[in-house]
């Protein structure tokens, strides 16, 4: 769903409401001032029958000022603008928040219930919701998730890091040092750097230097600039916040280390850094508005049933983080490749989809045909399927 348009409509209503509130307060304040001014004059005027006409003139002046201010007219104008914005807002909600999303369902898709349950249980464990995960596994009758204990250990390390205790994280990183190097991760260096800064923060420069010699010097080949900054920061140890190295006080260093540890921990488990369930639901949420619009507008008029279609009836653009595989679109037919219509590399090196090659060779009745992008005569027997 397009939440931006909903937010924009809400912001317009909120702005009109604030303006209405501000204008109302302004008018009430002006009226109150005029009333207080008139009361002060009346209190100063002697109360006698001879001054009755003066009292009436004062009240007449107040009435004249009220007429000039025209509070009702001003309030009606702001209220009218607010009412117009409030009237439009529900229409935006009705347009964006489709109450019936069942039109986008594929009812004939078969799911392996066991796999779906395992994905859901794995999601709970990845989020650290171990009690909920255990309850879900028990109620569904599934066997315990094989990664549960590993995630328990991961969260034990993360909880220690929240307390600025780096020992569990360092122990894990050191024991998996070779694997982290293969993954080209600088996690171990980051953790040692944080420990170095914690020692230095305790005003113990000598201990920090000894720690750097023992644990950080080994990373000099790959992380020399970072090591130089760490060592120079010791010169500003007592006023690091006012130094060129104040970045070392940023909580972002710890947050980045936590994210990197989580990413690498999941990587060594053979898991993606993000939960498959989260990715699936988020990607589906992005594609849903496009599908609903297509179903409501196009499919309803054509009386087609997309339940029998092998591919999505419309292109659903997803954010870059959901693009995991290369996609080939045939330059001739403009169709996206599929299992039934894979990309084929011709002898000249150009690539077309299989169905396009079949059409150009008239379903194989011709042993060769001219490439549409170069003067080469393509031999059908030499066309090879590409795998991205």
Curated annotation (Swiss-Prot):
PANTHER family: MACROPHAGE ERYTHROBLAST ATTACHER-RELATED (PTHR12170), PROTEIN RMD5 HOMOLOG (PTHR12170:SF11). Residues 150-207 form the CTLH domain. It comes from the Eukaryota. The keyword DNA repair does not apply. A zinc finger (RING-Gid-type) spans 330-374. One of its GO terms (biological process) is proteasome-mediated ubiquitin-dependent protein catabolic process. This is Protein RMD5 homolog. Transmembrane segments: none annotated. It is found in: Cytoplasm.
